[in-house]
UniProtKB/Swiss-Prot annotation:
CDD domains: IQCD, MYSc_Myo1. Gene3D superfamilies: 1.10.10.820, 1.20.5.190, 1.20.58.530, 6.20.240.20, Kinesin motor domain, Myosin VI head, motor domain, U50 subdomain. Residues 12-695 form the Myosin motor domain. It comes from the Eukaryota. This is Unconventional myosin-Ic. ATP binds at residues 53, 61, 104-113, 157-161. The modification N-acetylmethionine is found at residue 1. Myosins are actin-based motor molecules with ATPase activity. Unconventional myosins serve in intracellular movements. Their highly divergent tails are presumed to bind to membranous compartments, which would be moved relative to actin filaments. It comes from Danio rerio. GO terms for cellular component: actin cytoskeleton; cell cortex; cytoplasm; cytoplasmic vesicle; microvillus; myosin complex; plasma membrane; ruffle membrane. It is found in: Cytoplasm; Cytoplasm, Cell cortex; Cell projection, Ruffle membrane; Cytoplasmic vesicle. Interacts (via its IQ motifs) with calm. The keyword Kinase does not apply.
Length: 1026
């Protein structure tokens, strides 16, 4: 409640009951204007919420705002739709009585958005249970689906609901949403085939064309082009709207269908129906020379038959002929061009209308509470949301506007019954005077009365045989209703009014104002007939949805179906029964301007809506007796602090407490009255003075409460700290004493175990010496850890105790192995290769040949011949695949005369090659090499043994070089003959051609000498080297 006077002057009052001049419509509208200018779009009339469409996003619908309104009293915070929703929810929880929220207002006033905000609030604040998350999501996602198929852009609203919707949300005994149910009313099917200029067809057509996947559109026979290419989408000349994203809308609808539980096949069938309507619109007719009607667009007919799952020839015949059944006989007659076009449009409207009904039924199956029969559980309650068309007055008003405005009359009657009438009854119950108000029952009777009402006359004219027409219907209305105060026609009007009424129009004086209705099309729209031949075609459809919408039973039923107006009247009657069984809350929506512009307030337009919504009547009835009324308990609870006798608590009965309070506040007798259970305050200024006094008193109370609270808090804090200190002290002293005693016991046990273990240290391990032995082991291991060798050459090692000698040896070996492994991991690749060769040399020559120990420190080189020392022709002969890996200068001795010859020995990847300058003298493949022989002395001789069977070879090869250990090692590695190296002690035998053998004798001497001895052997004398 606005308490500060400056705030009230700036933003107005948040409850119209508090207006000083409550009879002034100008004051009412000015209060709306002030609040709208400050971004305050909600205002109360008692328990009725008035909402003004801001035409922009406001930061008042966040989750934080939802939490602010959860469980808060209706009048404790500023007006908000969340407050009204929470009030209904709490009444449902506490009183276990079904609730309903009625949202009304003209098209574009924000009814659909209001219902969505209420639904979002419930899905956020309600408790959860195992399966409620799915229900919440489906409840929310049902809105975009219904909007896509049931909403359209009109001149006044870019997202106008073209059908009425009533949704029940079912809650369990804990208040969690467990199900839902939707009722739909009077879908504007005529929009499928015709739209006024500046309006569009239903959203789904544009969303499919703009956002549908290429593959889907191809299957449906649609082009992702301008909607102007489709006859049913060009009537309004408004294919695209800047405020609507059809592409994003398709994504939202497609996702919502999946969440709700539609199968892919169902979505495909549904889109096929949507596409079939577009193809129907593009189906054109012509007349031949004989005047017979035929279809001129065969391609459209082919797509139609595929999408609807019917035979093409049968469909073609049904669109150009009609079947009449008379006295059991069937007759088929051709349709004129005009009749064929009308039948096509009726066909499209019937398909779309029944598909929409199927869609709502599918949503209901998805939202149904599976564990219990709907409405049957005693442990569940419902909140109903009514979002239905607002009062409509266009330049051209037809049958649809007549039904919509009739619906609004019924809702106004319900509002009168549940609100204004109940208000009057409250006054009478409290003993106040009766207040008069307008009751629109006379208008409802004018429309719906049996035999005399407009609907009854319309039905009678539709059933009359002969030349019944819209004009004869108008004449019948004039004859029957000519004297009614709320009915006027051109013929009945006086000269001044007659100019405003057409000859084919009649005027109804609604509660909201006067509306002229053009009778053209009333009979056809009321009949809403579909030729039997077309019904038969659809009954044979293989489309999953069409087959469910059109049953063969319809063809067997000979009764005339109820007219559209009668169906609507009956469904409205059922809706009224549902709403009357629930406790209502009201949201009255107002459109501030026709341009959908934020911040613009059109006073003339707002005044018209305030009038036809009956807001001033509602306010006058509430204020006729008293502006403010509250129960004794609520009034005393709020204002008891203003009187010392009632503060802080009143222990007597409530009426006496309120009387004591108002006496202290100096209320005058004419300013208030005490009823049986409530206090009534007549003037808003009395309440404002009381509110201002409460604001001032709050400051005093706040200071007192702060002072008392601080004193209490400090005393409590002191006692808490003192008690904590004492507890900590006593606890800590006990801990210290126990810890000290435990430490002494452990020390004594340790000393005792140590002494006993030392005495038995040389005995086998037992409980008496295990502590000492563990200590010795630990000490030794720590000593080893501190004195580990840093390199392989470090031979130091701590001396172990006798019991750990074996373990010490194992650890020492492991340590050395780790050092070696670590050393090996750090070796560079070239050094690794060097060591590998040295290891091979060691395995061959160590302890076998003189001079080996001197060769160990000397590194093996990669080659003893540089690249330029090898003749280029030799390299070319060897080729690129046979690269030289090692080369060394050698002396080759002839096999017969042992004449020395200078040669080069080249080791390649596959063979050993002996070269004389530019000529290859001999090539020995490694695979053919039988072995290698060297002497045990320090000479440089070695013999390569070759198979004697090889005709290309002349025998074994006797060679001598300065680095025999290096050369033989490399040759053995490359030829893989490591185990085929023979070290001879005295002589080496080698093969000569034709099975002969040669011998080399080795003797030790002071100098190196090589001669041929008398016995034909090669004698080699070499000094001994250690």
């Amino acid at each position: 409640m606005e308490s500060a006077l400056s705030a009230r002057d700036r933003v107005g009052v948040q409850d119209f009951l508090l207006l000083e001049n409550h009879n002034s419509e100008a004051a009412f509208i000015e209060n709306l204007r002030r609040r709208y200018r400050e971004g305050l779009i909600y205002t109360y009339i008692g328990s009725v919420l008035v909402s003004v469409n801001p035409y922009k996003e406001l930061e008042i619908y966040s989750k934080q705002n939802m939490e602010r309104h959860r469980g808060v009293n209706f009048y404790e915070i500023s007006p908000h739709i969340f407050a009204l929703a929470d009030n209904s929810y709490r009444a449902l929880r506490t009183e276990r009585r079904d609730q309903c929220i009625l949202i009304s207002g003209e098209s574009g006033a924000g009814k659909t958005e209001a219902s969505k905000k209420i639904l979002q609030y419930y899905t956020h604040i309600c408790p959860t249970r195992n399966n409620t998350h799915t229900i919440r999501e489906r409840l929310l996602q049902s809105n975009p689906v219904l909007e896509a198929f049931g909403n359209a852009k009109t001149l006044r609203n870019d997202n106008s609901s073209r059908f009425g919707k009533y949704m029940d949300i079912q809650f369990d005994y804990k208040g969690a949403p467990i199900g839902g149910h939707i009722l739909n009313y009077l879908l504007e099917k005529s929009r499928v085939a015709h739209q006024n200029h500046g309006e569009r067809n239903f959203h789904i057509f544009y969303q499919l064309l703009e956002g549908g996947e290429d593959l889907l559109l191809k299957r449906l026979g649609l082009d992702k082009t301008n909607p102007q290419h489709y006859h049913y989408l060009i009537k309004g000349n408004c294919p695209r709207v800047s405020s609507i994203s059809d592409k994003n809308g398709w994504k939202v609808v497609r996702n919502a269908l999946t969440i709700i539980g539609f199968e892919d096949e169902e979505i495909q069938a549904l889109m096929e129906i949507v596409a079939s309507v577009l193809h129907l619109g593009n189906t054109q007719f012509g007349e031949d020379e004989e005047g017979e009607t035929h279809i001129t667009t065969e391609a459209q007919l082919q797509f139609l038959s595929q999408l609807l799952g019917v035979d093409g020839s049968v469909l073609k015949a049904a669109l150009t002929h009609k079947k009449i059944v008379a006295k059991g006989e069937e007759m088929i007659s051709p349709l004129s061009l005009e009749q064929a076009l009308s039948a096509r449009d009726s066909f499209a409207k019937a398909i779309y209308g029944r598909a929409f009904t199927w869609l709502v039924q599918k949503l209901n199956r998805s939202l149904a509470f599976k564990d219990e029969i709907y409405y049957s559980s005693k442990c569940s309650s419902v909140i109903g949301l009514l979002d239905i068309y607002g009062f409509e007055v266009f330049q051209h008003n037809s049958f649809e506007q007549f039904c919509i405005n009739y619906c609004n009359e019924k809702l106004q009657q319900l509002f009168i019954e549940l609100t204004l009438k109940s208000e009057q009854e409250e006054y009478e119950a409290e003993g106040w005077e009766r207040v008069e108000y307008f009751n629109n029952k006379i208008i409802c009777d004018l429309v719906e009365e049996k035999h005399k009402g407009i609907i009854a006359i319309l039905d009678e004219e539709c059933l009359r045989r002969g030349d019944a027409s819209d004009i004869t219907f108008l004449e019948k209305l004039e004859d029957t209703l000519g004297g009614h105060a709320h009915f006027i026609t051109h013929k009945m009007a006086n000269g001044k009014i007659r100019k405003a009424i057409g000859r084919e129009e009649f005027r109804l004086v609604h509660y909201a104002g006067e509306v002229n209705y053009n009778v053209n099309g009333f009979l056809d729209k009321n009949n809403d007939l579909l030729y039997r031949h077309l019904k038969e075609v659809l009954c044979q459809s293989t489309n999953h949805i069409v087959s469910q919408c059109f049953h063969a039973d319809e063809l067997m039923d000979q009764r005339r179906p109820e007219t559209a107006a009668t169906q609507f009247k009956l469904s409205l009657a059922k809706l009224m029964d549902i709403l009357m069984s629930k406790e209502p809350s009201y949201v009255r929506c107002i459109k501030p301007n026709d341009g959908k512009q934020p911040g613009r307030f059109d006073e003339v337009l707002v005044r018209h809506q305030v009038k036809y919504l009956g807001l001033m009547e509602n306010l006058r009835v509430r204020r006729a007796g008293f502006a403010y009324r509250r129960s004794y308990e609520a009034f005393l609870e709020r204002y008891k602090s203003l009187c010392p006798d009632t503060w802080p608590n009143w222990h007597g009965n409530l009426p006496e407490g309120v009387a004591t309070l108002v006496k202290h506040l100096n209320y005058k007798p004419e300013e208030f009255k005490l009823g049986r259970s409530k206090i009534f305050i007549r003037f808003p200024r009395t309440l404002f003075i009381t509110e201002d006094a409460l604001e001032a008193q709050k400051q005093t109370i706040a200071v007192t409460l702060q002072k008392s609270w601080r004193g209490y808090r400090e005393r409590a804090n002191y006692h808490r700290i003192r008690h904590a200190v004492i507890v900590i002290q006593s606890w800590w002293r006990g801990v210290k004493g126990r810890r000290k005693a435990k430490h002494r016991r452990q020390a004594a046990d340790t000393i005792r175990n140590f002494i006993k273990g030392f005495i038995l240290r040389n005995e086998p391990r037992c409980p008496d010496n295990e502590y000492f032995l563990d200590h010795v082991r630990f000490s030794f291991l720590m000593k080893v850890k501190r004195n580990l060798p840093k390199s392989v050459l470090d031979k130091s090692w701590p001396k172990p105790p006798p019991s750990l000698t074996e373990a010490s040896e194992h650890i020492h070996r492991i340590c050395i192995r780790n050092l070696v492994n670590d050393y090996c991991r750090r070796i560079q690749p070239e050094w690794r290769k060097q060591l590998e060769q040295k290891v091979v040399a060691s395995g061959i020559f160590k302890g076998q040949k003189d001079g080996y120990s001197r060769s160990v420190p000397k590194l093996f080189v990669a080659t003893r011949l540089e690249a330029e020392e090898i003749n280029l022709k030799v390299l070319q002969t060897l080729g690129s695949d046979n690269k030289v890996k090692y080369g060394i200068a050698v002396t080759k001795y002839d096999r017969h005369g042992f004449r020395p010859r200078v040669r080069q020995l080249l080791l390649t990847t596959s063979s050993a090659v002996l070269v004389q300058e530019a000529k290859i003298k001999q090539r020995i493949d490694y695979g053919a090499l039988l072995g290698i022989s060297v002497s045990s002395l320090s000479d440089g001789f070695f013999v390569l043994h070759i198979p004697t069977a090889d005709s290309k070879q002349k025998g074994d090869l006797v060679l001598q070089c300065d680095h025999v250990i290096e050369a033989v090692t490399k040759l053995a590695i490359m030829a893989d003959k490591i185990h085929n190296v023979n070290i001879s002690q005295d002589s080496i035998r080698f093969a000569i051609a034709r099975g002969k053998e040669g011998v080399i004798d080795f003797t030790s001497g002071s100098d190196l000498r090589v001669v041929k001895s008398k016995n034909g052997h090669l004698s080699v004398t070499t000094p001994r080297i250690s």
